[in-house]
């Protein structure tokens, strides 16, 4: 078996979110190795939880600096989300990456088996409603990518891959072409357009959990739920009433919306369940 593990990116600014994530991850994945990739330098609070939640802390500052340099070329300043690129040069041969604005609702071990068929696997892809969060309409006229490459447009909050699939050298080699497409990228989504570009131009097999389920009819594959979908029901730390198992709940965009409107996030009771999971009762 390959050296397998999972990564998450966080800092102390999102400590509450990180605790909810960690509680949920360890509730369903008690033994898989886990590594924190620092979003920035302010990680003292979350790093102090490493013993309680059994995770390591990324130490290769040079590789994080490399990620920051890439983000500056797209945004003019360092953007912590780009540190996700470091994981292809990390300690795990095969790995899962999960965004921290999630709660994990199942064992993620099944995802590694899909690396027999794929070099890159995300949660969702090939949905027209997602494409606008990766590429602007103008990308088609640019002619640099095929329609299939553009339509892949994956949510990169959940990624399964292996080390050789995206080496730092291969990223460097394709950066000039990626930068040439920057005006066609939805850079308000930070690293997501670049990572999509790197995935679809890597020469490997790429897909998504949703795509695998649809192609094979295997609807027992756990799938991501988006908190913006108001049709879901939750109870006792679970999503209930769905015909497919739930992999995780993702509040992508919903925390920012809640802050802007002064309202609670959707399914706050699910998030609170995991945020308070290890707190003493009474």
Model feature map: region roles:
Residues 16, 41-47:
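Short, charged/polar "capping" segments at the starts of alpha-helices
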Residues 1-23:
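N-proximal low-complexity "stem/linker" segments adjacent to membrane-targeting elements
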Residues 34-40, 123-124:
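Short internal beta-strands
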């Amino acid at each position: 078996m390959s050296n397998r593990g999972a990564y998450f990116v966080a800092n102390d600014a999102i400590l509450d979110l990180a605790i909810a994530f960690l509680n949920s991850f360890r509730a369903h994945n008690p033994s898989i190795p886990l590594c924190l990739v620092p979003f920035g330098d302010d990680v003292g609070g979350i790093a102090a939880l490493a013993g309680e939640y059994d995770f390591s802390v990324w130490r290769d500052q040079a590789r994080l600096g490399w990620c920051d340099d890439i983000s500056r070329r797209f945004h003019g300043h360092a953007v912590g989300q780009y540190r996700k690129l470091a994981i292809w040069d990390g300690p795990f041969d095969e790995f899962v990456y999960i965004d921290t604005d999630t709660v994990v609702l199942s064992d993620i071990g099944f995802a590694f088996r899909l690396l027999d068929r794929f070099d890159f696997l995300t949660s969702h892809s090939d949905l027209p409603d997602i494409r606008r969060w990766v590429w602007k309409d103008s990308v088609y006229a640019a002619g640099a990518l095929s329609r299939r490459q553009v339509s892949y447009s994956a949510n990169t909050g959940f990624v399964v891959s292996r080390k050789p699939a995206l080496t730092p050298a291969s990223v460097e080699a394709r950066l000039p072409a990626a930068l040439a497409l920057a005006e066609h990228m939805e850079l308000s989504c930070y690293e997501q357009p670049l990572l999509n570009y790197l995935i679809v131009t890597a020469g490997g097999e790429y897909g998504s959990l949703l795509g695998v389920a649809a192609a094979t009819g295997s609807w027992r594959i756990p799938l991501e739920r988006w908190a913006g979908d108001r049709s879901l029901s939750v109870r006792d730390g679970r999503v209930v009433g769905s015909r497919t198992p739930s992999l995780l709940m993702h509040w992508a965009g919903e925390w920012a919306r809640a802050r802007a409107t002064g309202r609670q996030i959707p399914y706050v009771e699910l998030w609170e369940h995991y945020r308070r999971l290890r707190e003493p009762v009474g």
